[in-house]
Amino acid sequence: MEQNQTTDDMQKRVDNFISQFEEGYFSPLSMLARFTEEIGELAREVNHVYGEKPKKKEEKENTIENELGDLFFVLLCFCNEQNINLSEAFDQTMSKIESRDKNRWTKKNNEEDFHE
């Protein structure tokens, strides 16, 4: 298992796996359905851990980490199928959020603030 992979590395790894099959990537609508399915599985797991609904005794053991991994895999597939570089998409989103929301929330005090 590789540690500290870049998103580019992850996208290439997923593409290497998917490209060995004739079927290739699912269509965008099918991937959106898969993404929704994985969100539901994540929600179910979060509900078991933090909500009032315990797992049934016969229910398989799972973790939030596993569900996030499944969700991330589908996201990488979606990006690859659409020729979207996830790193670039993330940078664009963070630039937008850092600009738009820089004064939206109450900032934590820095140590420098205590010396004024």
Language-model features: where?
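Flexible "arm" and connector segments at domain edges
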Residues: M1-L68, F72-E116
